[in-house]
């Protein structure tokens, strides 16, 4: 069990670029460690052109024995330009390509990563964006499997889950008004039946999970509108909006006085002891850090999140 009451704030600060975003936390049973994967933005890049500092990013990896004390481990290694995106042949005005927003699932003794690939290093928000599937045994070195054929070539922020033998991927389709979109697969590689999940404005970072005997969808409502939560009976369709969390800027913890972005969820415990932990990032200018809070069920049946509930106890790992 992750003891959130002992979590530092910030939880993690990338020691190389101070631009950790898009956290995804998963337990590796073979390594007996928690792995945190994140986009390693180049937040301290000197004199960047436009938003080039958000491009050219690698996938950072931190590990933890307890889910609260994190140590920077490495950046993800692998073929298909995963190791060194800046050395790749890109289509943008600056050298290289970009990796963003990894999502993970553990299946058949392998970690499966679905990560956004941008085909260049751009100074604006252009370029082709696809979801790429990699696998890994150790969680550090990955092998390319396939590039998903989805609803457009402007898709980002994939997460994958399984219901009754079918895999579902939710993602942001920027070519469809940045709506949350869902595709399905029987083999984790051939994706079909793309359809819109929610019509509620621009969204990114969709993630589906089980909590309180129900299916939940959490999204980052852009721009700076907090984390919207939806509920479904079957986890596939019929999503109903319930509430929004981490919308305010009244966090009292260090570097937590801003809207929460791009959630990663860990649900632990059972029954009355079940907890929904949310890993998210906050901005301080270009620089970002990862924070940890708890989503709880309010008395009215709507999720709430008091980020100030637990006081920080130690300095963040990675500093």
Please annotate each region the language model reported:
Residues 1-319:
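Carbohydrate-active catalytic/glycan-binding domains of CAZyme proteins
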């Amino acid at each position: 069990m992750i003891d959130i009451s002992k979590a530092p704030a910030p939880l993690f600060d990338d020691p190389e670029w101070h631009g950790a975003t898009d956290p995804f936390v998963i337990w590796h049973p073979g390594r007996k460690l928690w792995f945190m994967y994140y986009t390693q933005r180049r937040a301290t890049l000197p004199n960047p052109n436009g938003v080039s500092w958000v491009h050219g990013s690698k996938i950072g990896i931190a590990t933890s024995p307890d889910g609260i004390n994190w140590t920077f481990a490495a950046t993800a290694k692998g073929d298909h330009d995963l190791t060194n995106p800046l050395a790749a042949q890109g289509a943008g005005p600056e050298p290289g390509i970009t990796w963003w927003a990894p999502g993970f699932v553990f299946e058949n003794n392998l970690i499966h990563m679905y990560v956004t690939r941008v085909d260049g290093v751009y100074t604006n928000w252009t370029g082709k964006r696809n979801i790429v599937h990699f696998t890994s045994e150790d969680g550090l070195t990955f092998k390319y499997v396939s590039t998903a054929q989805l609803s457009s070539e402007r898709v980002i922020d994939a997460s994958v889950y399984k219901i009754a033998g079918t895999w579902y991927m939710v993602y942001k389709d920027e070519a469809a008004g940045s709506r949350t979109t869902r595709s399905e697969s029987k083999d984790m590689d051939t994706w079909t039946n793309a359809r819109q999940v929610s019509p509620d404005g621009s969204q990114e970072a969709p993630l589906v999970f089980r909590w309180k005997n129900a299916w939940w969808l959490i999204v980052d409502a852009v721009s700076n509108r907090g984390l919207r939560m939806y509920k479904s009976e079957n986890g596939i369709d019929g999503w109903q909006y319930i509430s929004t969390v981490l919308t305010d800027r009244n966090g009292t913890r260090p570097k937590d006085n801003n809207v929460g972005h791009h959630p990663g969820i860990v649900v632990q415990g059972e029954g009355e002891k079940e907890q929904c932990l949310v890993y998210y990032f906050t901005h301080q200018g270009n620089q970002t850090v990862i924070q940890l809070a708890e989503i709880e069920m309010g008395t009215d049946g709507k999720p709430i999140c008091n980020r100030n509930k637990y006081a920080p106890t130690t300095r963040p790992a990675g500093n």
